């Protein structure tokens, strides 16, 4: 009993002592909080020396959370006294205390520049995976960072070539339509599976989901390109299915003047760029303009290599429109306020006639619609206004956006006169009757889309003690999309137009809205980072059907000074494009399969689940960094076109390994990457494949640059692609298959009315012919492996630069393909000479 009493008394004394210590600690913490706030008050009223002296005298005794604030205030004090050396010293101390410290838009610009400069000197940072800057080692998914210097060294002409050069798993596909890329074997007719952003602003169309990595996105304005290799719907919703590409522009201070460049090359290439950038106190401004045009390279296509096998002739590859592609824009930042405005125009000439017909056509014979020749033409306007402010311990940012696009798809269906094309396509009988017997059949679709949106997001950074720290991010977004002023036409005899009833044209009009909310937690404990996020999207389609999708993400990262290991899972979705759903409905309406009031919509969202394990190492050998990533993807309901309609017909289960490395030594730099991909399940149109389609199983790139002299820099790029498997539909056999299908249906109806042996025998024979024709509809071909080499050089003298780049220097002849088309010849040896001057 006595011992028990002693124990109780000891515990009581310990409790009293603990309470006293806690109270004392709280009192001490409050005292230091008062000291810091007094210093902050002195700084705000201009007594900078007093604030500096107070902070320095108590710096070692501040608790962890106050010490970070004190370092920040000491940097501001030193900058206020124009003592950059001391400011940099305390900025270094701040980042030593918290390597993941991030500035906010409310911070002075000089402070932001100093922190970013020091962080970039330690390791590269990106903002795409979160709303604040992160190092590559702490991002939750494998990420490729492409710098301005890497872009110059690649000999690339546009964003497509930059991505295919540096991003493991990304390759060029040619769908006889717009400029396009595939990510880990997944792609569509247009580039609609990858979210492309400009300074965080979505560039993908809301009607088609397309954002082509073409010449309407200039490279001269780019500071860096951040590429998330994997699903990212947990942050960006229903467009970021396979990857996210965020194009980050330079700031005005990076340019600090005016830069102009002009160039010309073979095949009618003309290129011009202008940059203006300045910083005036708290105002940073960047203005850019770029244009590019090319007449294209001619290739002769023999009859047997066409889809219709009706005519041979020349096609044009690499043609960029009657009007040049251009990119005009302005980025302004004043204190906490940011504004972006961008105008893009692109006009790409299709080498062949539409889709499975892929035949030469006489481009110059066809009439123009509103000045637009046969092409895929897009003119877009993007505007973004945002304001950020610290509210207590939370950084809040609000953004309003406006996007407008004029979309035109003007396709040649068939050049010579034929009834086969009209029989195959789902065109109403009365319209077929007008066009029957004429050559020069075409289709023209145009629409004006408008989208307004608003977004609110917040970031709360917390520090519990020296080992626990993190950030909680949250936000919500609303967007409203409307497609109006739709024009739909068929053309015949090259320059004649069919009058389409308004009842058909009006089927393309409509509007949709989307709401979403997300939350993301990033918690850092010792050498571990837990990154988890969840987003919910609610979409109201034009037909009042609802899309409800959850997009989770989870990553665990283990950090060491020279290496890191991360495991991640993410799920993404992309809703079926508005245009696809409307096209399906329009075809059904024209063929009298539905009435005008039927708003049925049969296309579902596409989904992708991805598991990734990544090992990255820095400076294991002097100058060498590398990353090895293994992935397993499960994609379902992938949409493909079957003649004129679209279906959720694709399933892809793929796995692979990606390797990337960079090395730098004195005047020599090298970047290399390689990807191997296998397929465990690939289904399309109820057909099974043991490989990916029109993308290589093995791909590799190497970019080497060497500064030969003080004024001369040389560069080269090697690109290897293994054998590729191509699949498309034979349009002639498809027409035969449809003919026998109609015959079978007629005989079935006859046999039901009159079941005699003669009709039964004819039905059985027709059924066999139908099956034989169906078996010949799928076409399988192969593309041989190949290696391409590019060379380039830059000579600089004072403010003058001269560049020469030669693509495919050995003039390698090869083909490429994509979905819904045959083999398309690719560019041979193209060169471009450019002259630039900095004012």
Residue ranges and their predicted role:
Residues 332-346, 376-544, 627-628, 661-664, ...:
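Face-selective signature of the C-terminal outer-membrane beta-barrel domain
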């Amino acid at each position: 009993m006595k011992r028990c009493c002693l124990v109780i008394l000891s515990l009581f004394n310990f409790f009293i002592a603990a309470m006293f210590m806690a109270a004392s600690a709280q009192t001490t913490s409050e005292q230091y909080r008062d000291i810091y706030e007094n210093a902050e008050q002195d700084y705000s009223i201009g007594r900078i020396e007093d604030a500096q002296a107070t902070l320095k005298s108590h710096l070692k005794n501040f608790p962890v959370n106050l010490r970070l604030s004190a370092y920040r205030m000491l940097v501001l004090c030193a900058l206020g006294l124009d003592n950059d050396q001391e400011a940099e010293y305390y900025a270094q101390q701040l980042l030593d205390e918290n390597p993941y410290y991030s500035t906010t838009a409310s911070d002075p610009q000089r402070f932001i520049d100093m922190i970013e400069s020091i962080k970039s000197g330690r390791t590269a940072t990106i903002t795409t995976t979160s709303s604040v800057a992160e190092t590559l080692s702490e991002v939750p998914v494998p990420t490729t960072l492409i710098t301005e210097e890497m872009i110059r060294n690649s000999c690339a002409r546009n964003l497509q070539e930059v991505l295919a050069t540096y991003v493991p798993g990304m390759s060029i596909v040619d769908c006889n339509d717009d400029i396009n890329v595939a990510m880990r074997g997944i792609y569509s007719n247009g580039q609609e599976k990858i979210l492309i952003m400009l300074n965080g602003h979505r560039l993908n169309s809301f009607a088609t989901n397309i954002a082509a990595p073409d010449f309407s996105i200039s490279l001269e304005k780019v500071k860096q390109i951040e590429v998330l290799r994997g699903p990212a719907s947990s942050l960006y919703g229903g467009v970021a299915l396979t990857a996210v590409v965020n194009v980050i522009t330079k700031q005005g201070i990076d340019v600090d003047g005016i830069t102009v460049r002009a160039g010309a090359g073979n095949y009618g290439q003309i290129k011009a760029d202008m940059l203006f950038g300045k910083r005036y106190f708290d105002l940073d401004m960047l203005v850019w303009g770029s244009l590019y045009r090319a007449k294209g390279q001619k290739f002769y296509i023999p009859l047997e290599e066409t889809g219709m096998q009706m005519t041979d002739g020349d096609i044009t590859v690499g043609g960029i429109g009657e009007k040049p592609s251009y990119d005009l824009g302005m980025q302004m930042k004043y204190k906490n306020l940011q504004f972006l405005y961008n105008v893009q125009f692109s006009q790409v000439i299709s080498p062949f006639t539409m889709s499975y017909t892929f035949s030469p056509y006489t481009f110059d014979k066809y009439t123009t619609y509103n000045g637009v020749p046969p092409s895929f033409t897009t003119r877009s306007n993007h505007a973004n206004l945002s304001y950020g402010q610290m509210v207590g311990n939370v950084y809040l940012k609000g953004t309003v956006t406006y996007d407008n696009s004029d979309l035109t798809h003007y396709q040649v269906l068939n050049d010579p006169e034929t009834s086969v094309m009209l029989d195959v396509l789902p065109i109403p009988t009365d319209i077929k009757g007008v066009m029957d017997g004429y050559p020069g059949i075409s289709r023209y679709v145009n629409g004006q889309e408008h989208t307004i949106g608003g977004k609110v997001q917040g970031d709360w950074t917390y520090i519990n003690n020296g080992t626990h720290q993190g950030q909680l991010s949250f936000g919500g977004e609303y967007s409203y999309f409307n497609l109006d002023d739709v024009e739909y036409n068929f053309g015949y005899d090259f320059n004649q137009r069919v009058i389409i009833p308004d009842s058909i044209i009006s089927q393309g009009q409509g509007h949709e809205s989307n709401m979403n909310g997300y939350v993301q937690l990033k918690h850092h404990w010792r050498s571990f980072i837990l990154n988890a996020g969840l987003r919910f999207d609610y979409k109201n389609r034009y037909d009042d059907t609802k899309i409800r999708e959850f997009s989770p993400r989870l990553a665990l990262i283990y950090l060491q000074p020279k290496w890191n290991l991360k495991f991640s899972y993410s799920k993404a979705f992309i809703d079926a494009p508005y245009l696809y759903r409307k096209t399906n409905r329009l075809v059904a309406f024209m063929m009298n399969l539905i009435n005008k009031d039927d708003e049925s919509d049969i296309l579902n969202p596409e989904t992708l689940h991805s598991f990734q394990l990544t090992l990255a190492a820095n400076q294991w050998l002097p100058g060498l960094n590398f990353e090895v990533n293994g992935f397993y993807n499960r994609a379902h309901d992938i949409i493909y076109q079957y003649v004129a309609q679209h279906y959720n017909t694709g399933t892809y289960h793929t796995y692979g390994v990606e390797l990337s490395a960079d090395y730098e030594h004195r005047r020599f730099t090298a970047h290399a990457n390689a990807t191997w991909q296998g397929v465990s399940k690939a289904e399309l149109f109820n057909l099974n494949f043991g490989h990916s389609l029109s993308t290589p199983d093995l791909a590799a790139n190497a970019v080497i640059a060497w500064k030969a002299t003080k004024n001369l820099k040389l560069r080269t790029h090697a690109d290897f692609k293994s054998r590729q498997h191509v699949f498309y539909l034979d349009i002639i056999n498809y027409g035969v298959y449809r003919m026998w299908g109609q015959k079978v249906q007629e005989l079935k109806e006859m046999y039901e009315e009159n079941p005699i042996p003669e009709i039964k025998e004819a039905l059985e024979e027709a059924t066999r012919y139908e099956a034989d024709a169906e078996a010949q509809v799928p076409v399988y071909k192969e593309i041989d492996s190949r290696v391409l080499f590019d060379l380039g050089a830059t000579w600089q003298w004072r403010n003058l630069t001269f560049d020469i780049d030669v693509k495919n220097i050995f003039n390698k002849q090869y083909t490429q393909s994509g979905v819904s088309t045959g083999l398309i010849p690719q560019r041979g040896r193209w060169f471009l000479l450019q002259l630039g001057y900095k004012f």
